[in-house]
Amino acid sequence: MIHRFHTRIAKEYGIVEAVLFFNIAYWVRENEKSSRNFHDGYCWFYNSVREIAETTHDYLTENQIRRALKHLVESDMLYRGIYNKKLYDRTYWYTLTPKARLMLDEIEMELDKK
């Protein structure tokens, strides 16, 4: 599997954060295209930390993923919510904040110029 990130995000937030951020951004956009996982005016991505570690980021520990997600939420790059149908399911859902979307737009415009 190929993972990518932009150095601007990595410099500001960390490499693990940048890798996770771009993966979440990809899935949020895919969900938007297929009109899935909309709640409270946002389109969301969800997976447990364990699922993220086992399926897409097997080179990261669960603690690295947990810390990076917490950092991205605290840095206003991701919103975190719980929208599970089963009340006992405490899997977090993540979406991009307006700040994150603006940064992604700037990065994409920068890449389009090259």
Where does each model-flagged region fall?
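Short recognition helix of helix-turn-helix/winged-helix DNA-binding domains
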Residues: M1-E51, P98-D105
